[in-house]
Design a protein with these regions (language model features):
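Conserved nucleotide-binding and Mg2+-coordinating catalytic segments in signaling enzymes
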Residues: 11, 171-190
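Short regulatory alpha-helical segment in sensory/regulatory domains of signaling proteins that mediates
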Residues: 10-18, 26-36, 196, 200
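Amphipathic alpha-helical "output/dimerization" segments
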Residues: 121-158
């Protein structure tokens, strides 16, 4: 069963590249299917790049993004995510008055770290869930690329509309005198051509 689970997880997450909220829910639904006792997914506001031999600095922008516990799956939009703070750490955000043995997996792709995954699983399951975490990290990388492409498309759409509006204004200015509103030479010539063309068509 587990031999085909990783490709299935990859496909299901890749189908959610247009919607981060759906992506998070799908990730937790997969944790439910794997029968973890509970799972918590924490994400950084922005991925952090760690280079080899650099001093590690504890991130200040880690937030609870989704969870699965007591057969309940939930996810949070960015501005609804609870941050990890000195007063309310990871353990407090995962507290449900039950005893747990969490295995913690860093979610990364290449040199970028995206967050961490906390799963209440048996120790012998660690290698398999490590591979799961690698796939989630890779899918988070694809999600980051997808969001960047969506932003670029929006910017290009705005720029194109701005160019069209400027062309409309320039076209109007080039046809009319700004002070009098009368047709200038170009505008008069174009209007005359249209008038002559319509006269010819009517005679035909």
């Amino acid at each position: 069963r587990r031999s085909w689970f990783i490709p299935s997880l990859a496909r299901s997450l890749n189908d959610c590249m247009e919607d981060e909220y759906a992506f998070l829910l799908e990730a937790m639904e997969n944790m439910r299917e794997l029968r973890t006792k509970c799972t918590y997914l924490f994400l950084l506001d922005e991925p952090i790049v760690y280079h080899q031999n650099e001093k590690w600095i504890c991130p200040q922008n880690l937030r609870l993004a989704a969870y699965y516990r007591n057969e309940e799956v939930d996810a949070f939009h960015f501005y609804d995510r609870q941050p990890v703070t000195d007063q309310k750490g990871i353990c407090q955000l995962m507290s449900d008055d039950e005893r747990h043995q969490f295995m913690i997996f860093l979610l990364f792709s290449g040199e970028k770290q995206y967050g961490l995954l906390a799963c209440d699983i048996q120790q012998e399951e660690f290698p398999f869930f490590y591979v799961i975490s690698l796939q989630i990290g890779l899918s988070l990388h694809y999600l980051e690329i997808s969001k960047a492409e969506a932003r670029r498309r929006q910017e290009m759409s705005r720029d194109l509309e701005l160019v069209r509006e400027r062309n409309r204004v320039l076209g109007f200015i080039s046809k009319y005198d700004e002070l009098t509103g009368l047709l200038n030479l170009r505008g008069f010539t174009e209007q005359t051509k249209k008038f002559c063309s319509s006269e010819i068509n009517q005679r035909a």
